[in-house]
Amino acid sequence: MPDSKYTMQGYNLVKLLKRLEEATARLEDVTIYQEGYIQNKLEASKNNKPSDSGADANTTNEPSAENAPEVEQDPKCITAFQSYIGENIDPLVELSGKIDTVVLDALQLLKGGFQSQLTFLRAAVRSRKPDYSSQTFADSLRPINENIIKLGQLKESNRQSKYFAYLSALSEGAPLFSWVAVDTPVSMVTDFKDAAQFWTNRILKEYRESDPNAVEWVKKFLASFDNLKAYIKEYHTTGVSWKKDGMDFADAMAQSTKNTGATSSPSPASATAAPAPPPPPPAPPASVFEISNDTPATSSDANKGGIGAVFAELNQGENITKGLKKVDKSQQTHKNPELRQSSTVSSTGSKSGPPPRPKKPSTLKTKRPPRKELVGNKWFIENYENETESLVIDANKDESIFIGKCSQVLVQIKGKVNAISLSETESCSVVLDSSISGMDVIKSNKFGIQVNHSLPQISIDKSDGGNIYLSKESLNTEIYTSCSTAINVNLPIGEDDDYVEFPIPEQMKHSFADGKFKSAVFEHAG
């Protein structure tokens, strides 16, 4: 029998036994080291004292690659959402920095909302579906809601900014984060895209010629809605994909939040030393009013100053005038013309007119509660002010809608309705699908109308500053105006269906001829 039968791949049994003994010795050394390490940790936790040896501390604090727990791989729906953020939101952030810092701040808040939603989805795919009305589920959405609220506050604090249309578009589209709480998320994303598109049209109108970044920004922003719909259709068609046999949602959310924080924090190897503590705060400023409750204010206290000195002088009565210095005649300007010529004070003085009549404070006006109610076949939307979210109405063709006494409100009307009225509003916008009879605008300032499908006519009376956006289906809309100014109509007849603005004429020419008055639009030649 050949000798090779007693060997294993070129090694004899003696060598294999020696290697086995060496491996066993190493394992024993590792076991002894681990036992000593655990014992030192227990003693250190009891005594609450740091380790004496800095080298040992650095050695023990370094994580071992062999003992590190295996990180669970994210499912495909999570990696796809990460790719969505990187391909859609990150380019928007970079482009917003080229436009203005306030737009960049708004995009950072929007990105923060998507990052919080990523943490939520990581927990959802590993847990059972919770009760949507539970406090745990509400707490999980709180970081997302905080970003939406901050975005609305940023918009309100920059109403005078020239980039207010950007902030409004982001604020109107931000509530799309709520798709995780509904069973039909795709249609919700579409609704908020339509609400945001009202403001993106204004961006294109104002900056199409002056800022090429604005056109690119609008394209990327609207594309982010479409790409989000594609992602939801593929992974969450009927709502968030939960795991039937998964862990409890609260535990999964805590684990997902912890992992997110660990990922964002610097690694121990890169941080060689803890940063120095912040400097102590400066000493508080001295108090303006120095009041002593122990002793009353005396003349010595009056010399020291403070509120005690003020009360001491007031309590003197008529003696307070004894401290005034007598002015000599040579120092009186009304008796010395030379002083009047050299004085910087005007000799005639400034004759101010009567004070302006104070206006009635707005707080004294009766403020009625907001009303959104269907009475019979008529919707009433009244007394809404500064609404951060759009008011959505699902109406039928036999119903009419009345919007009155509202300020800074966006109303979105879905479906075909009978008639729409906009009365006594300020900075209100209406986005509608179709209307059978038309729309009336009465005593409204700075209004906006966007028609998605068809509208036979628009009647405008005693209104100023209106912008109307018509669709291709509504190019035949008839517009009647009376006692109105600054009305502009935007039609999608440009290249790539871009909107072209047409101002409504305001000046009329009236002439008498052949026994009749003839009226025509007055045009300025040249």
UniProtKB/Swiss-Prot annotation:
First and last residue of the signal peptide: none
Compositional bias ranges of the Polar residues kind: 45-64, 290-302
UniProt keyword ATP-binding, yes or no: no
Region (Adenyl cyclase-binding): 1-168
Matching InterPro entries: Adenylate_cyclase-assoc_CAP (IPR001837), Adenylate_cyclase-assoc_CAP_C (IPR013912), Adenylate_cyclase-assoc_CAP_N (IPR013992), C-CAP_CF_C-like (IPR017901), CAP/MinC_C (IPR016098), CAP_C_sf (IPR036223), CAP_CS_C (IPR028417), CAP_CS_N (IPR018106)
Coiled-coil boundaries: none
Gene3D superfamilies: 2.160.20.70, Adenylate cyclase-associated CAP, N-terminal domain
Something else known: Present with 8760 molecules/cell in log phase SD medium.
Protein name: Adenylyl cyclase-associated protein
Gene designation per UniProt: SRV2
